């Protein structure tokens, strides 16, 4: 007798998939379908704050890092919620510049995107984030890196004391559900506020804003770009896949899961909300948590979506020899070119 629940979940996925395909039959990726899907994504992300709080940005410190200036600032995203933000400003000329919102993945927080130690010194090894924010500012892009909720200094106080290397994703995700919110939703909301901040800067070309995410930061980037058309170009590194092939196939952080989303969409459907705007997907061929087979499956569906919108030339991808990491061998230059044109 087999008492395990594996078969139950497999069957539930198939039943849900079949029902979803019936509901979207004949209208998949049409204007009506995309509008409905956007609404369902917004619903699955949970409640956003009812009042838009003034950002009130303050520059705390400015340092010269040779190739760029690093501003440490803070702004307010929600009542009683201040966010530490790094801003990398190019040295070539005097603005205005195209800009990028950089969304880091799991790890030490915003400093991973720059490759910095806690004291602000440059680390010897770039790590899996590959100093992507520095690579972008070197290409003449102003880069904003907010500390994402649940990482770095934005963890729960008790968890910072208990384990310096442990995120607060589990605590925040579970408790936010009790308020009709999700951690993914709060992160997307704060990404939208980061776009507000970028557009408020005199040295930013407001019509040329991109977003670059890695791993869980790609989730934030994909959903933010899908909901907010102020984003001109998007890079998703180390995340694009199918839910079935990744977060349903193995253990992943709880911050990846959205209530009821499979009733309406698989992951490529949601990423497809970015179309027809420019999108670049990169993934390591040996990424163990976002398997290559399912990356290829997602890319094929995204190509179909972009083709259907007569925008296939706006979609690019790179499967590089590597693991769960940022490559940037093609995506860095691609994003810079998109935002300059």
How would you describe each model-predicted region?
Residues 1-69:
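N-terminal targeting or regulatory segments adjacent to alpha/beta-hydrolase or S9 domains
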Residues 47-95, 99:
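N-terminal cap/lid segment of alpha/beta-hydrolase-fold proteins
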Residues 95, 103-189, 200, 246-248:
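Cap/lid segment of the alpha/beta-hydrolase catalytic domain
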Residues 171, 178, 193, 231-271, ...:
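Mobile cap/lid helix-loop segments that gate and shape the active-site cleft of serine hydrolases
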Residues 203-215:
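Alpha/beta-hydrolase fold nucleophile elbow
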Residues 274, 281-283:
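Short beta-strand/loop motif that positions the catalytic acidic residue
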Residues 300-341:
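C-terminal catalytic histidine-bearing segment of alpha/beta-hydrolase fold enzymes
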């Amino acid at each position: 007798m087999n008492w395990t629940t594996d078969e139950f979940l497999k069957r539930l996925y198939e039943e849900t998939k079949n029902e979803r395909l019936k509901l979207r039959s004949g209208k998949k990726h049409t204007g009506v379908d995309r509008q409905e899907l956007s609404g369902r994504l917004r619903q699955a992300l949970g409640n956003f704050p009812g009042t838009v709080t003034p950002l009130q940005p303050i520059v705390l410190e400015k340092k010269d890092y040779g190739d760029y200036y690093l501003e440490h600032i803070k702004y307010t995203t929600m009542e009683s919620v201040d966010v530490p933000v790094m801003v990398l400003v190019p040295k070539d000329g005097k603005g205005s510049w195209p800009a990028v919102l950089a969304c880091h993945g799991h790890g030490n927080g915003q400093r991973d995107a720059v490759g910095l130690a806690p004291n602000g010194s440059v680390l010897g090894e770039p790590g899996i984030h590959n100093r992507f924010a520095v690579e972008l500012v070197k290409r003449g892009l102003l880069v904003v890196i907010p500390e994402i909720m649940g990482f770095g200094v934005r963890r729960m106080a008790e968890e910072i004391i208990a384990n310096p290397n442990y995120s607060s994703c589990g605590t925040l995700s579970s408790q936010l559900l009790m308020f009709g919110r999700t951690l993914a939703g709060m992160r997307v909301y704060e990404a939208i506020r980061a776009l507000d901040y970028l557009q408020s800067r005199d040295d930013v070309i407001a019509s040329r804003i991109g977003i670059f995410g890695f791993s869980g930061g790609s989730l934030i980037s994909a959903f933010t770009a899908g909901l907010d058309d102020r984003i001109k170009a998007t890079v998703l590194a180390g995340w694009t896949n199918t839910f079935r092939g990744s977060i349903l196939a193995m253990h992943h952080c709880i911050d990846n899961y959205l209530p009821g989303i499979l009733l309406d969409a698989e992951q490529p459907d949601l990423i497809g909300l970015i179309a027809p705007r420019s999108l670049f997907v990169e993934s390591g061929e040996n990424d163990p948590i976002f398997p290559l087979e399912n990356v290829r499956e997602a890319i094929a569906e995204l190509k179909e979506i972009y083709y259907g919108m007569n925008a296939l030339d706006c979609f690019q991808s790179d499967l590089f020899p590597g693991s769960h990491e940022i490559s940037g061998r093609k995506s860095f230059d691609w994003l810079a070119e998109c935002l300059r044109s």
